[in-house]
């Protein structure tokens, strides 16, 4: 997938880039796999903002993605590679031999006409999904389950991949994109290959309007707020923040302050932290 630039007709067009989407084969999604999405504006059921900078944006339909890949030993043919506005990766529409249609996350190299299979006896081939127990050590994988049968939760965004490092009894060691090495049970499933749309991370948004179309609202600096809105707010003109170190809007230390719980259950499954050398 290539990235294209634009003629500098405006200051924003000078810097703006976008994907060419040459892998996309259709612009019409499968209607039976669409559901409506209601905008929340970043608010919870009580109307309170729980996620800042969310609101507006283009209307979307949610594509129902098969993260479980539990239809075993039935080959599925790739009918189309499609754009999904709800994620950075592309998705593939597959039709099983019995006629059922499903969307899956499209890996790099998957093309229209290819066949993918799920199950313990599947070949080690891009797009196939099988338990980690049956995947050779060193294989590049994505779409990884944390609990068997729950559906993939890890390594699902554009251009990402993990690597199977070792297998020891009921657990495997998987190196995640962050560099963290983690224990994952061998009965959990993973898909072979790298997630599609690898150039997503080098795209330059270029202008605020593109972010607004994506449903992202502006981020205001705390130093220009009032003191009742932010710890950095208030004062005459460009005042110092008035604290030994920066603070979040809720008064907690910002910039490097650890917020993860010290006694989290999943700590026991982390073999190597992402910051460890």
UniProtKB/Swiss-Prot annotation:
Coiled coil: none
Superkingdom as given in the UniProt entry: Bacteria
Signal peptide location: none
PROSITE patterns: RIBOSOMAL_L2 (PS00467)
This protein's GO CC annotations: large ribosomal subunit
Pfam families: Ribosomal_L2, Ribosomal_L2_C
Protein's UniProt keywords contain Ribosomal protein: yes
One GO process term, biological-process aspect: cytoplasmic translation
Annotated stretches, region: Disordered: 219-277
GO molecular function terms listed in the Swiss-Prot or TrEMBL record: RNA binding; rRNA binding; structural constituent of ribosome; transferase activity
Keywords: Ribonucleoprotein, Ribosomal protein, RNA-binding, rRNA-binding
Record Gene3D superfamilies: 2.30.30.30, Nucleic acid-binding proteins (2.40.50.140), Ribosomal protein L2, domain 3 (4.10.950.10)
Record's function text: One of the primary rRNA binding proteins. Required for association of the 30S and 50S subunits to form the 70S ribosome, for tRNA binding and peptide bond formation. It has been suggested to have peptidyltransferase activity; this is somewhat controversial. Makes several contacts with the 16S rRNA in the 70S ribosome.
PANTHER family in alphabetical order: LARGE RIBOSOMAL SUBUNIT PROTEIN UL2M, RIBOSOMAL PROTEIN L2
Subunit relationships: Part of the 50S ribosomal subunit. Forms a bridge to the 30S subunit in the 70S ribosome.
Similarity remark: Belongs to the universal ribosomal protein uL2 family.
Protein name: Large ribosomal subunit protein uL2
